[in-house]
A protein has these predicted regions:
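Periplasmic-binding protein-like
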Residues: 141-150, 248-268
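Short, well-ordered beta-strand elements
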Residues: 30-41, 59-65, 132-133
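Short, low-complexity disordered leader/linker segments with a strong preference
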Residues: 1-33, 269
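A conserved helix-loop-strand patch within extracytoplasmic ligand-binding domains
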Residues: 106-155, 254
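Short helix-initiation/N-cap motifs at beta->coil->alpha
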Residues: 63-74, 161-189
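A bilobed periplasmic-binding-protein/Venus flytrap-type ligand-binding module shared by bacterial periplasmic
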Residues: 113-124, 226-238
Length: 270
């Protein structure tokens, strides 16, 4: 009788263990998909590169491509996607402040130097007085573009404006440039219609623009605008996110960036 009870008890324990394992397995299966929003290049290209590595960890990486700088942050905050990969910290922080969001960076990966391009002029000195210069209209990238122009002594900004400078903060403009504030994604399309445009690397690349070859003025490689993987606060320790961080900062990714972008259009920072 004691043996029967013992066997019954062991069977119950075994069944409980199997049941628990099944529950864990289901939970793991439910959480195995990781959805990350990204702009096409280089972000989506990098994510697609590491998808097989995450698959080995039991994680299916789903890459959702966006062509603007607003929707991917809305999607992370609302929980529609798990993370995004397209922005730098100053932009993320300004977005949090403006919308009351709770976005945080989990890892920095690379810098995409900003550059001034022109279809009409071949040298910076050729840009005439009164020229129209298109710049990004989002808070941090607009300030970043103006700081780039200031670095070449084309304009002077009020030092109090900092990274969020706008054309209203220009205190000296000897050549009387006219600034056209345009959504960053649209800048390559309007390049032919203006005298010059300051374009973010992730939009310049798909448009066939090479910063080193085509840029009249290029941001230094020591730029503080490192691109990051962003999640909603509280999700930093999600095992899927940790696996993504490990994969996206691997030697494989570093070599991919150096090989695919040998002209410094994208510079790894890890």
């Amino acid at each position: 009788m004691k043996n029967i009870v013992k066997v019954a008890a062991l069977t119950a324990i075994a069944l409980a263990a199997v049941s628990s394992a099944a529950l864990v397995g289901c939970k793991k299966k439910d959480n195995a998909v990781l959805t990350v929003g990204a702009t096409p290049e280089p972000h989506a290209a990098i994510l697609n590169l590491i998808a097989p590595d995450l698959a080995k960890e039991g994680i299916t990486l789903k890459v959702v491509e966006f062509t603007d700088y607003i929707t991917p942050n809305d999607a992370v905050e609302s929980g529609q996607i798990d993370a995004n990969f397209f922005q730098h910290v100053p932009y993320m922080e300004s977005f949090n402040k403006e919308k009351g969001y709770h976005l945080v960076s989990v890892v920095g990966t690379h810098v995409e130097p900003l550059a001034l391009y022109s279809k009409k002029f071949k040298a910076l000195a050729d840009i005439p007085a009164g020229a129209t210069i298109a710049i990004p209209n989002d808070p941090t990238n607009e300030g970043r573009a103006l700081l780039l122009l200031q670095s070449a002594k084309l304009i002077t900004l009020d030092p109090k404006a900092g990274l969020t400078a706008t054309p209203q903060n220009v205190t000296e403009n000897a050549k009387k440039f006219q600034f056209k504030e345009i959504e960053a994604a649209s800048l390559p399309r309007v390049l032919a219609d203006v005298d010059g445009a300051v374009i973010n690397g992730n939009y310049a690349l798909p448009a066939g623009l090479n910063a080193k070859k085509d840029g009249l003025l290029i941001e230094g490689a020591d730029s503080p605008y490192v691109n990051v993987v962003t999640v909603k606060a509280g999700n930093e320790n999600d095992p899927r996110i940790k696996a993504l961080v490990k994969a996206i900062t691997s030697d494989k990714v570093r070599e991919f960036i150096k090989t695919k972008y040998p002209n410094g259009d994208v510079v790894p920072t890890f």
